[in-house]
Amino acid sequence: MNRKLVAACAVVLSALPLAASAQEAPAGPSQDAGWHNAQQAALASRQASDGWGWLEGGVLWRRVAGSGTGPRPTLDDTVTLHYAGTFIDGADFDSSYRRNEPATFPLRGLIRAWQLAVPMMAVGDTIEIAVPAAMGYGPVGRGPIPGGATLLFKIELLAIPSR
């Protein structure tokens, strides 16, 4: 009987380093349930009565300036725009406005949310979009953007230089 007890203790003791290392792994913000709930709540708080419309994949958008009439880009176009990207808490992660320099990008090379929203714009329009993680940088993230982050953008279409 003592041999069984010693064997059982040996098994438990040998597993302790594995359990300790699993518990010591830091939980990043994208792994926290409360953080994920806040990301979803930010999307749910935007209402149609406030001018928000739905696009594919749960992307929300609204026009804040302009009429939507005039030349519109397609996925094959290059676009020049000003933009500001923030997290749901308002913290800025990127802004061409801050740099005081518009950005020019091939539309097809941008995140899926932008590929859907920017073609809804005419030159001179400004929109806001709320981007669920799946339509932005996904579960892994990129640079300062953590995986699972809902992103908010203000986008102003200045030109379609590819035309």
Annotate each language-model stretch with its function.
Residues 2-9, 13, 18-163:
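Cross-family detector of peptidyl-prolyl cis-trans isomerase
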